[in-house]
Amino acid sequence: MADMMNVRLSLQAAAAQWGEGAQLSFNGDETRIHLGAIAQENDALRTIQRAARRLESSGIKRVKLVGDDWNLERRYAFAQGFYAAKGARELDFGPQSESDARELDALIKATRWVREVTNGCPEAIYPMSLAESALLLIRGLGGDQVTARITAGE
């Protein structure tokens, strides 16, 4: 696991050597995402997603989220930014509760489905296939709690 980049959130501003307002700093196998004095959580989530995108675009393919400042929304924001349509990425979300892990997995599955539908070719995504695909996703996420019926025709 030595080749994984550890990613930690920091509430401190980055050192001056990284530039004014820098959102990322590096030290060995650890990257810090500097949230600084961000007061609004929505701004923090945007910063986290943007930083993840920068890491991914710089060629980093394997990361592990470390530290106590990661919650469900922050992990999901990072996952949104650490995405590429081509090539494998490995993202270890670090320790989290079982319920958070299930919810995060469901969010990521739903996001992946939306991307596949959005980027799919029109021949493969016609109304019935879209309905069936959506139903499979929802049943996969909801399990026995979901019942549905597709009505086709005029």
List where the protein language model places each region:
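Short amphipathic alpha-helical segment within the helicase RecA-like ATPase core
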Residues: 1-154
